[in-house]
Amino acid sequence: MVRTQTESSTPPGIPGGSRQGPAMDGTAAEPRPGAGSLQHAQPPPQPRKKRPEDFKFGKILGEGSFSTVVLARELATSREYAIKILEKRHIIKENKVPYVTRERDVMSRLDHPFFVKLYFTFQDDEKLYFGLSYAKNGELLKYIRKIGSFDETCTRFYTAEIVSALEYLHGKGIIHRDLKPENILLNEDMYIQITDFGTAKVLSPESKQARANSFVGTAQYVSPELLTEKSACKSSDLWALGCIIYQLVAGLPPFRAGNEYLIFQKIIKLEYDFPEKFFPKARDLVEKLLVLDATKRLGCEEMEGYGPLKAHPFFESVTWENLHQQTPPKLTAYLPAMSEDDEDCYGNVSWPGWRARQVALGPPCTGLHARAPDPRVICSRKGRVSVPLRQACWWL
């Protein structure tokens, strides 16, 4: 996300800065002298505001629904940034001003090695710019698709990094609400950097608010409480963590169907299968995270927080104190990669060779009345209609 705002052209509702974040007109705002400062003390000089011409823009790193992320080199320092660029006119037209403001404000609160860092913001008459740390190795999802599934050592290491990041984030009173492999980037040294905070929620300490009441997220990782109660909590991120651990081992998320409606039905009924060769300790961890009752998930406040989660047998060999200084393991495939032709646009695929264990708990869905699309018509990522999909045999 990016924001910009000039004195002459400022989109309504986009502040120039905030107390907790960098001002939109350049680097972080300088603190004002306090009441006890000398009468004639001069404020420190403000750094020159950054402008687009200060950078050489290169390849496109990613494109969202209303933003583009471009690799840029600062001419004065030769330092590389991922600069998120967004047109003011578009965000106003699409009512995305709160999204942009939220991302800026949340990222300005974070100072942790496992999160993308916001270095500066600036703007011109037409565009907003966020200067972000450059995660050179791209999305975690890319490696899941390339490798197929991670071996136990890799699964443990990257799961531990995500747990460490969530512990920090939740300690700040922030819910991510859209945690998924696409939003977990890998930097040059192969450490994770979590990104995309446009749908994040900062909980209010005054009201002791523990939930965020709006429907956001991605179908395969949405928690059941968001579907039944229309609200998310810190424990909703732990549900997403369980889905990600499953995907690291199996290569696909646990809840898959021909369309979002059917995916939601499976989530609410807790219907998913474990492959026969799923690591036993990882399986136990996933089962303790994919729990319908948000207050019973391992790691949530009602279950004594992150201590019991980090003490789970799956993490027995993990040294938590210096994860960001440990050498990441070489990515090693547990099972071969799946062809894109085997997966539809919802991650749905037929897996022969499974000894399916169906987990079916909870009442049927009562809160969703939308008519489901015809499940026989499934669009693949390459735009074809496939009925049925070609079966994948990579788990045999």
From Swiss-Prot:
ATP binds at S65, F66, S67, K84, S133, Y134, A135, E139, E182, D196. Phosphorylated on tyrosine and serine/threonine. Residues 1-11 have a biased composition (Polar residues). GO terms for cellular component: cytoplasm; membrane. The keyword Kinase applies. GO terms for molecular function: ATP binding; protein serine kinase activity; protein serine/threonine kinase activity. CDD domains: STKc_PDK1. Residues 1-53 are annotated as: Disordered. SMART domains: S_TKc. InterPro entries: Kinase-like_dom_sf (IPR011009), PDPK1 (IPR039046), Prot_kinase_dom (IPR000719), Protein_kinase_ATP_BS (IPR017441), Ser/Thr_kinase_AS (IPR008271), Ser_Thr_kinase_AGC (IPR050236). Residues 86-130 are annotated as: PIF-pocket. Residues 55-315 form the Protein kinase domain. Pfam families: Pkinase (PF00069). It is found in: Cytoplasm; Membrane. Keywords: ATP-binding, Cytoplasm, Kinase, Membrane, Nucleotide-binding, Phosphoprotein, Serine/threonine-protein kinase, Transferase. The active site is at D178 (proton acceptor). Its EC number is 2.7.11.1. Its main location: cytoplasm. It comes from the Eukaryota. It catalyses: L-seryl-[protein] + ATP = O-phospho-L-seryl-[protein] + ADP + H(+); L-threonyl-[protein] + ATP = O-phospho-L-threonyl-[protein] + ADP + H(+). It is a peripheral membrane protein. GO terms for biological process: intracellular signal transduction. Belongs to the protein kinase superfamily. AGC Ser/Thr protein kinase family. PDPK1 subfamily. The PIF-pocket is a small lobe in the catalytic domain required by the enzyme for the binding to the hydrophobic motif of its substrates. It is an allosteric regulatory site that can accommodate small compounds acting as allosteric inhibitors. Phosphorylates and activates not only PKB/AKT, but also PKA, PKC-zeta, RPS6KA1 and RPS6KB1. May play a general role in signaling processes and in development. This is Putative 3-phosphoinositide-dependent protein kinase 2. It comes from Homo sapiens (Human). The gene is PDPK2P.
